[in-house]
């Protein structure tokens, strides 16, 4: 059978096509079924992930085929509630935005008691942790996958309430980290090595499921993901964030995901994102983009933000835009966003 093509999201550059064999797809679905989801049986899969992307194809097509169960595809109806009235053991294939929907239907999920959620394509959201916290003890389970179009799933961990970031990731059984990989020059972070932040490195792995780039004769021997990690054990690690989300502003380390989390808490109802940009004085910086009728003036949004805690630098500029471009799986198309930006709409905050 011909290989199956999947394109990267184009979130940081032009999309690239990667090819996978049917055997690789079937192997990954079976592996995640056994190593992550465990022995529990499912009577139905409800998927919010579009099958033209790898994550959606694996768990909207391949896994149901392995299980021999029907699929309810809701990727074109992201606000549709999954069927929960019949008590059928259900696997929910979630995108980051799905958890807001689930958070509005906690009583139905609690009554059902036989729902498992699978999460990927982006970090878990505050809504995901609210859902798992509220449903603790009801039989609801949730798991998170880390991976990419190039590698497939690499590692997994439960989605938990509370100190979620403290939970280490575990490599999938067929994934290895080359022992000769050392942190590249400048990869170490500013933290104390004792707290797990002293030996950060990009995650490089080998796996029989690595995809083949279109035009290449074979898959690469290994692949380096844009994720910064610190080892915990031989097959576990802490995830510090994506390298593209961790910047240094005049020597001060800044996690853009953390800035977004704080900004959304202070500006409820505002759709906003941060994008890294080059800076002629500081080397690199970031700018904030938001959508919505309010506040009408970007300077008002900066005032709503106030002073960011923990020494996080304020955005270099704030832009109000007509829309935030996203891929079908919800990833922000950063290159498209920053290419269309206008000159700073309010004075730089130093």
What are the roles of these predicted feature ranges?
Residues 321-342, 350:
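Flexible lysine-rich "adenylation lid" loop at the C-terminal edge of ANL adenylation domains
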Residues 104-164:
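Gly/Ser/Thr-rich phosphate-binding loop
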Residues 138-182, 190-201, 211-221:
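Conserved ATP-binding loop and adjacent catalytic segment of the adenylate-forming AMP-binding
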Residues 1-7, 40-43:
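Conserved pre-ATP/AMP-binding loop-to-beta segment of ANL
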Residues 220-313, 330, 336:
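AMP-binding/adenylate-forming catalytic core of the ANL superfamily
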Residues 34-71:
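Conserved AMP-binding loop of ANL adenylate-forming enzymes
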Residues 3-30:
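Conserved AMP-binding A3 loop
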Residues 68-88, 98, 254-259:
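ATP-dependent adenylate-forming carboxylate-activation enzymes
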